[in-house]
């Protein structure tokens, strides 16, 4: 039986309205009763996730910023990974041929150069929001990641530009169809989960994980039991064709699967 379960948030554990469903909360409580370690592995900021865990009285480890930070149950920082200052400078100062908005993250929060009110709908659950700044005055030595949000085709073209400019100096991935992220080299949820399991004396084979986007690829591919959401990005399914696909996040599919796993561990599962 798995001893640790890792969850992506958006498109996986959260429903389309960006809330946690009651069935999901009940299932998380059942996992803790079985002494199964919970880990939330998300692109969201540590400050936001710590607020959510506190509001829900949930005990869980945190992998945030798509692996740039790992925190213990008590909020202790166990691992950090930042963009090199020269990479952050290039991405922030270059004039990219894109309509996408740019968003910068460090330990103090989420920063952007102009209002993007539509993006705040994603954070309605927590109330987390950006701070407007002059991007050119952003401290370069503490940037965890930089995101571009916009149309997928536009972001795909931007990805090519970024690859040409950065080469092997950064890791690029789509955390959603409308969000392209620039991360430190080697930084992903799978690498962060390895840090997490080593700290607990566990093997990745002891872990189960759920996800829906390309930023979940390394995590899902490295654990003993990885599951892809029915609403997942097609690219993720293509990258990991051997992994089982469960239902849609709108139906709290993670809870549906885990309830079956807890109650009928020896019977085959159907997402219907």
Curated annotation (Swiss-Prot):
For this chain, the annotated S-S bridges are none
Cofactor needs: Mg(2+)
Top enzyme category: hydrolase
Recorded hits in SUPFAM superfamilies, A to Z, give:
HAD-like
Binding residue positions for Mg(2+): 8, 10, 212
Has keyword Disulfide bond?
Answer: no
The catalytic site is made up of 8 (nucleophile)
Q: What NCBIfam families does the record tag this protein with? A: Cof-subfamily, HAD-SF-IIB, PRK15126.1
Q: Which PANTHER family match?
A: HMP-PP PHOSPHATASE, PTHR47267
Q: Which family does it belong to?
A: Belongs to the HAD-like hydrolase superfamily. Cof family.
Name this protein carries in UniProt: HMP-PP phosphatase
Organism equals Shigella flexneri
- Cite the source lineage: Bacteria, Pseudomonadati, Pseudomonadota, Gammaproteobacteria, Enterobacterales
Q: Name the encoding gene, please.
A: cof
């Amino acid at each position: 039986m798995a001893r640790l379960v890792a969850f992506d948030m958006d498109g996986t554990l959260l429903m389309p309205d960006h809330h946690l469903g009651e069935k999901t909360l009940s299932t998380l409580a059942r996992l803790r009763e079985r002494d199964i370690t919970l880990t939330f592995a998300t692109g969201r900021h540590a400050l936001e996730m710590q607020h959510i865990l506190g509001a829900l009285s949930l005990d869980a480890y945190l992998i945030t910023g798509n692996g740039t930070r790992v925190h213990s149950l008590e909020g202790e920082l166990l691992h950090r990974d930042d963009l090199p200052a020269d990479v952050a400078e290039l991405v922030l100062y270059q004039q990219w041929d894109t309509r996408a908005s740019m968003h910068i993250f460090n330990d103090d929060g989420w920063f952007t150069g102009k209002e993007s009110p539509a993006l705040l709908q994603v954070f309605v659950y927590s109330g987390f929001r950006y701070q407007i700044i002059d991007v050119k005055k952003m401290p370069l030595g503490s940037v965890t990641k930089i995101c571009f949000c916009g149309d997928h085709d536009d972001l795909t073209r931007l990805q090519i530009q970024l690859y040409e400019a950065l080469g092997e100096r950064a890791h690029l991935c789509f955390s959603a169809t409308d969000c392209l992220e620039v991360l430190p080299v080697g930084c992903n949820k799978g690498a962060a989960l390895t840090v997490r399991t080593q700290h607990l004396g566990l093997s990745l084979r002891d872990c189960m994980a759920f996800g829906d986007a390309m930023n979940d690829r390394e995590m899902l591919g490295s654990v003993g039991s990885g599951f892809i959401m029915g609403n997942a990005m097609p690219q993720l399914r293509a990258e990991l064709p051997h992994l089982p696909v469960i239902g849609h996040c709108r139906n709290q599919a993670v809870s549906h699967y885990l309830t079956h796993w807890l109650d009928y561990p020896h019977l085959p599962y159907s997402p219907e």
